[in-house]
Amino acid sequence: MKIILKYIISLKILLWACIAIYPQSYPFRSISVAEGLQDLIVNALYKDSLGYIWIGTASSLERFDGVHLKSFPIPEEGKRKDVNTIIEMPGHELWMGNRTGLWKVNGEKLLRVAADTIRSGVYSLCSDGKGTLYIGSESGLFIYNSKGVERILLDPNVLSGANFIMGM
């Protein structure tokens, strides 16, 4: 009798456990060219403090508000435009790095930043939360703040692969 009772209790516990781990159904919606996405190659995603989802594609930066897409085309003609990284700085400033350099979202358009200093692809961005932006690029680490842009080489040979920073 005790064995049967233990068996019944064990069976009930297993049934309750199965019900508890039953897969949840989450609403999922895909976004494609039909919804206004400029390119199907997505390299970077970022959710900002206002709730927008920023999508970095092979040809533009897109802002998704949950319903509509707003495209921010990259104005460089004939160049590889791949968006590699996106970050938000204090004050809701959105920055992105691509194969041509560093960009800032300025209202409804993209503004190239430090084009004379950062002339190579930007692959990673990191903020200290106080207004300093660390930029990992094909040609070293750059530090951007209110004083300007400073370049830091990890290897004195500018062509060295050690200066190619993909992530931080």
What do the PLM-derived regions correspond to, one by one?
Residues 1-168:
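Carboxylate-rich, polar loop motifs that coordinate divalent cations or form catalytic acidic clusters
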